[in-house]
């Protein structure tokens, strides 16, 4: 049987997916952009901001951003490609994937997919529609394909330093700063 938390997570996911919108005005307007972000240390209240707990009890968390040996260890680089494809490359996980059709990019439900986070970013930012369309149409509109490199340097998974959430933020920030989402 599934617990209340699982039911709640499915409801939140379903609501989020319903509310995603495809941004038909997005364009690639620069050739390459890199985002580097710091890590996060939780000083108090950890997990009290996580549903369903925070919905029932409220939540307050105190975090601080930190550098690792003076460096921002979470990095995402987006680079425009002339080819009609999307490439994901996770250097720290040593995985590489190339996509020339849209359906695999729209499939974000597999928690073991090494690119689930990157795919979710493209859906959440409106770069890829949640259903339908073709990758050729999307990339024609954007002005080309692109490669997304990601890397978390010298930080083990599960360290408690926020690498997954910060990598998510870096992906979104890189998409916006590459001006895939061009706001006129």
Per-region residue spans from a language model:
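Anion-binding (especially nucleotide phosphate/pyrophosphate-binding) glycine-rich loop
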Residues: 34, 66-180, 184
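Short Gly/aromatic-enriched secondary-structure transition segments
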Residues: 51-66
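Conserved SET/PR-domain catalytic core that frames the SAM/AdoMet-binding pocket
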Residues: 36-53
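Short linear interaction motifs
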Residues: 19-29
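Short, surface-exposed loop/turn motifs at beta-strand boundaries within globular domains
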Residues: 28, 34-36
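Long, Pro/Ser/Thr-rich low-complexity/intrinsically disordered regulatory tracts in eukaryotic proteins
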Residues: 26-28, 48, 71
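Short, small-residue-biased leader/transition segments that mark boundaries at the very start
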Residues: 3-8
């Amino acid at each position: 049987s599934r617990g209340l938390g699982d039911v709640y997570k499915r409801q939140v996911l379903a609501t989020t997916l319903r509310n995603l919108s495809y941004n038909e005005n997005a364009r690639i307007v620069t050739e390459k952009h890199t985002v580097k972000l710091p890590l996060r240390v939780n000083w108090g209240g950890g997990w009290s901001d996580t549903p369903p707990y925070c919905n029932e009890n409220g939540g307050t968390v105190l975090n601080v951003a930190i550098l690792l040996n003076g460096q921002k260890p979470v990095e995402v680089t987006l680079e425009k490609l002339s080819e009609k494809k999307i490439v994901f490359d996770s250097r720290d996980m040593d995985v590489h994937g190339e996509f020339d059709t849209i359906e695999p990019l729209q499939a974000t439900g597999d928690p073991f997919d090494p690119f689930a986070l990157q795919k979710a970013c493209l859906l959440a930012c409106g770069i890829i529609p949640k259903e339908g369309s073709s990758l050729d149409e999307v990339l024609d509109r954007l002005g080309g394909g692109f490669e997304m490199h990601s890397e978390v340097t010298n930080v083990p998974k599960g360290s408690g330093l926020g690498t997954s959430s910060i990598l998510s933020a870096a992906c979104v920030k890189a998409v916006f700063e590459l001006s895939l989402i061009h706001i006129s």
